[in-house]
């Protein structure tokens, strides 16, 4: 009962993340000397590699060292986040992941990056659930550990979340509508699924001072 894989497409909202980040942040230098992409764990490396390649940035990764002798809340607890990559000192970092559940792992990653003297920390995830509430994110923002949190509107966003000064709502409505329209007209999805050209145009406008 194997499901054929060739009928599935991976849709990455990278263009939308960059678009909304640049819209809300001025004077970012998007090059390998001033910015890095970070994967919070080994499972998200494919996503982060794509993100880094499209933007022409260096990549760093954390792996979770776990205590396999104990189980806490149904999981082996994380003992430490070990970092693999070049120095983040003085650089802006973009942490890329698919989901924020409780956010504990993401915040631990941000804290470790700040300990390593990263400049600004931006968190980009497709689905933001925030199952443990927003108090920890508030605390980390107030303490200067995180600067922005970007999640899409593909899941419900509470009014409380939308009101946070650090939160950026990444609207996917137009992109999803274009995908549906192309499918209904049997058109190619290639240009929609590969955002490189659109991102390059966006970066050119940003660097030229256009918003």
Feature names for model-found ranges:
Residues 1-211:
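PRPP-associated nucleotide enzymes
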